[in-house]
From Swiss-Prot:
Assembly: Heterophilic interaction with SREC2 via its extracellular domain. The heterophilic interaction is suppressed by the presence of ligand such as Ac-LDL. Interacts with AVIL; the interaction occurs in embryonic dorsal root ganglions at 18 dpc and induces neurite-like outgrowth.
Lineage summary: Eukaryota, Metazoa, Chordata, Craniata, Vertebrata
GO cellular component, one term: plasma membrane
Pfam families found in the cross-reference section: EGF_laminin
Name of this protein: Scavenger receptor class F member 1
């Protein structure tokens, strides 16, 4: 039961395996092969099972299953096994039938029978052939082959038909084809009638000579060999030793270095003199330069070393190197060393480097030919010539790859030709010229109108000094247009300039130098080139546009074109401070200077209410030290006379006096014109004092780049600038300070208007000047009344020049703006 279940399981597994593999191995032209669901898929037709590439196994399953005695011949059809028939399939087929249920007829009958399953014929004796159709010809002493018909004779008979008897010893047999006797061992002769006498060794059948067995020798094989190894000669008994042994009896092994029969062969080049195999002669490893199993083959040409893995160097004419070491026997010219790897030393060349090189100026000689190989940039036999134009490199052998054909003789980099150099020069000069033109234009734009040659000081270096004044004045005018405030971070000490005049009021101004690059801490600098420190101190006061002088509004000269006074931008013209003697003679207001001090109104009064209207002017030195009393007495001419016949212009204060003395913001460079005057008009009985506050001193920070450029520009133009008279802008008449006291008392606007009417010069055409780094407020110059003042000016100009008397120029009366 278990066996049946096991067989059924195996059969099912086999069925599944065949079904799984049938789709991939079937032949489309095989038996019972059908197409599947797709054209490319093949499968067995229903009722058939795959076998190899066809479907030749029928399937009988279920109700159509066959019994044990039956086989399935077609799907669902069972028959008896071949050779049987009947209801139980137990009866054998008759001789003339074969196959399933004995349905096939046997063609061999009656001379043979068919095989039940295949139908092959089995012939009866004396018949042969495929269907047993041929009778045998062997007679009674032989049998024929059923396939071929050849006769097999019985012993003692021979011939093709087995009809001839043999003529041999009965114990022997004869050849069936020839009838020759074949003797058994120990017998010899034509009929095998003689016995051999060879001591158990066979003898030759035709001659009876003994053929000795191994270990025996002699004519009758009666002598035993004495060899330990190998075989002895059957005739002489000498031992034939096997490879690796030698001696009479082959009892000795081969000596080291030898191998083979009788140890007659020598070993090859085994490594470290190792012995080779005494039998074969093979080496475990070979010496360098040898190859092969027996190390008897040298390395192929071009190789050397162990196992011939090294490559030979380049020897002379390509000859092979030594197979063991790789050394060259000879080297090519220009090389040295065992492997010809070292070039000739400097100064030698040729075969074996035995020749001396010629002199090469810029290069080395060729190690082979001895010719000079020039360095880059040189050529010639001795390398003493530079490369011609258009070539570079070693021996000047490479042409230049440049548009103009010129290149560096060593590196080959392109160099500029005539056109390239011109383009480079133009490219450099054009920006420089543009920059220079910009600087010149900037300088002329900032310098304003040049001074008339007669207005320049006559001391040495005055042109350069006045040029610097123009530059600083232009910058200061730019700063004056800005509102009160700080433009930088310079901190300067306070300097107070007080003016005492009962007739002319002054505004109070906080003044700052236009440049931070003062050379010293002096309050007022002199011309650095003049050498005179105490004369002609120039000051500069930038005006404010909103400050309109009262005299200009009230005077009749205000109706003139442009007004009777210069415009605010012309009020910045520098003027020299007059000497005390000149002030006394001209009845000018006395001016006193105190450096480093600060005057403030006391007891609630403004600076215009100071005590005495009559003060002696003091001359200010560089160190702000007073002059000796004797000198002051000499220069002083007495008390000033105050003109009370005309009313002085009313001056109003634009701010609180207390605020006028407030500290400026730190580092201020702006002119902070915060005017400070008295609240009421100036009284005739008491003298009015106007105080001007100025910032002076050495800055705490270095000058900026803009100021440095302008300062250097002034130094450059010091010797370049020639005095030229500008005819386009006429200068107003210079008004010298009168020395007679009779000239005092006229109104400031009257004389000035007369002078302008006589010269027909507009006040706004008056040129502006610059101070030498210090700004000051202009004091009002009161011209003398009457027409004689103009004549006196022309007569006294020469006298004032000789005395180098400082003059006032383009003085604008400063008044407070009108009250709103």
């Amino acid at each position: 039961m278990l066996a049946a279940m096991g067989l059924e399981l195996v059969f099912s597994l086999l069925l599944l395996w065949t079904q799984g593999t049938q789709g991939s191995t079937l032949d489309p032209a095989g038996q019972h092969v059908c197409k599947g669901s797709s054209p490319s898929e093949l499968q067995c037709c229903p009722g058939w099972r795959q076998k190899d590439q066809e479907c030749t196994i029928p399937i009988c399953e279920g109700p159509d299953a066959c019994r044990k005695e039956e086989v399935c011949v077609k799907p669902g059809l069972c028959r008896c096994k071949p050779g049987f028939f009947g209801a139980q399939c137990s009866s054998r087929c008759p001789g003339q039938y074969w196959g399933h249920d004995c349905r096939e007829t046997c063609p061999c009958h009656p001379r043979g029978q068919c095989e039940p399953a295949t139908g092959d014929c089995q012939c009866q004796p004396n018949y042969w052939g495929r269907l047993c159709e041929f009778p045998c010809t062997c007679g009674p002493h032989g049998q024929c082959d059923p396939k071929t018909g050849l006769c097999h004779c019985d012993p003692g008979w021979w011939s093709p038909t087995c009809r001839r008897p043999c003529q041999c010893n009965p114990a022997s047999r004869c050849d069936q084809a020839t009838g020759t006797c074949v003797c058994p061992p120990g017998w010899w002769g034509r009929r095998c009638s003689f016995s051999c006498n060879c001591h158990t060794s066979p003898c030759m059948q035709d001659s009876g000579r003994c053929v000795c067995l191994p270990g025996w020798w002699g004519p009758e094989c009666s002598r035993k060999c004495q060899c330990v190894r190998g075989q002895c000669s059957v005739t002489s008994g000498h031992c034939s030793c096997p490879p690796g042994f030698h001696g009479i009896r082959c009892e000795l092994p081969c000596n080291p270095g030898h191998y083979g029969a009788q140890c007659k062969e020598s070993c090859g080049h085994c490594e470290l003199n190792a012995t080779c195999s005494p039998v074969t002669g093979n080496c475990e490893s070979c010496k360098p330069g040898w190859n092969g199993t027996q190390c008897k083959q040298p390395c192929p040409a071009g190789t050397f070393g162990e196992r011939c893995t090294g490559q030979c160097p380049r020897c002379r004419l390509g000859e092979p190197c030594q197979a063991e070491t790789g050394h060259c026997q000879h080297c090519d010219p220009g090389w040295l060393g065992h492997r010809c790897e070292n070039p000739c030393p400097l100064g030698t060349f040729g075969k074996g480097c035995s020749s001396t090189c010629p002199a090469c100026a810029q290069g080395t000689c060729d190690a082979v030919t001895g010719e000079c190989v020039c360095s880059a940039g040189y050529w010639g036999t001795s390398c003493n010539s530079s490369c011609p134009a258009g070539f570079h490199g070693n021996n000047c052998s490479m042409p230049c790859q440049c548009p103009e054909g010129l290149c560096h003789p060593v590196s080959g980099t392109c160099q500029l030709g005539r056109h390239g150099k011109n383009a480079l020069i133009v490219g450099i000069l054009v920006p420089l010229l543009l920059l220079l033109m910009g600087i010149v234009c900037c300088a002329y734009c900032c310098s304003g109108t040049r001074l008339d040659p007669k207005d320049r000081p006559e001391r040495n270096g005055a042109a350069f000094f006045r040029m610097k004044q123009q530059v600083w004045g232009a910058l200061t005018n730019l700063g004056s247009a800005l509102p009160c405030g700080s433009l930088s971070n310079y901190k300067l000490p306070w300097v107070t300039v007080s003016h005492h005049d009962p007739e002319v009021p002054f505004n109070h101004s906080f003044i700052e130098p236009p440049s931070a690059g003062w050379a010293s801490d002096d309050s007022f600098s002199s011309d650095p080139d003049s050498g005179e420190e105490d004369e002609a101190h120039a000051y500069f006061v930038p005006p404010r546009e909103e400050m309109v002088p009262m005299a200009q509004e009230e005077s009749p000269e205000a109706s003139l074109p442009g007004g009777s006074f210069p415009p605010p931008e012309d009020a910045s013209t520098p003027f020299p401070i007059p000497r005390t003697s000149s002030l006394a003679r001209a009845k000018r207001p006395s001016v006193s200077f105190a450096e480093g001090t600060k005057f403030a109104p006391q007891n609630g009064r403004s600076s215009g209410d100071l005590s005495s209207p009559i003060r002696k002017p003091k001359r200010l030195s560089r160190g702000a030290q007073p002059r000796p009393e004797g000198q002051e007495a000499e220069e002083s001419t007495g008390p000033e006379q105050v003109n009370t016949e005309e009313d002085a212009p009313t001056a109003t204060s634009s701010g609180d006096p207390a605020t006028s003395h407030g500290q400026l913001p730190p580092g201020s460079q702006m002119v902070a014109e915060c005017a400070e005057t008295t609240d009421g008009g100036i009284q005739e009985s008491s003298g009015s004092v106007a105080t001007i506050y100025m910032l002076a001193g050495t800055p705490q920070k270095p000058e900026g780049p803009v100021w440095s450029v302008f300062r250097r520009l002034g130094n450059y133009q010091k010797d370049q600038m020639d005095p030229k008279v500008k005819s386009a802008i006429p200068k107003p008449l210079r008004r010298s300070l009168g020395r007679n006291q009779a000239s005092a008392g006229s109104a400031p606007g009257a004389v000035l208007s007369q002078a302008m009417e006589s010269t027909a010069v507009r006040p706004e055409e008056t040129p502006r000047g610059l101070g030498d780094g210090i700004e000051s407020s202009g004091t009002v110059q009161e011209p003398d009344a009457g027409g004689s003042s103009l004549e006196q000016d022309s007569q006294k100009q020469a006298e004032e020049k000789e005395q180098e008397e400082p003059l006032y120029e383009n003085v604008v009366p400063m008044s407070v703006p009108p009250q709103h």
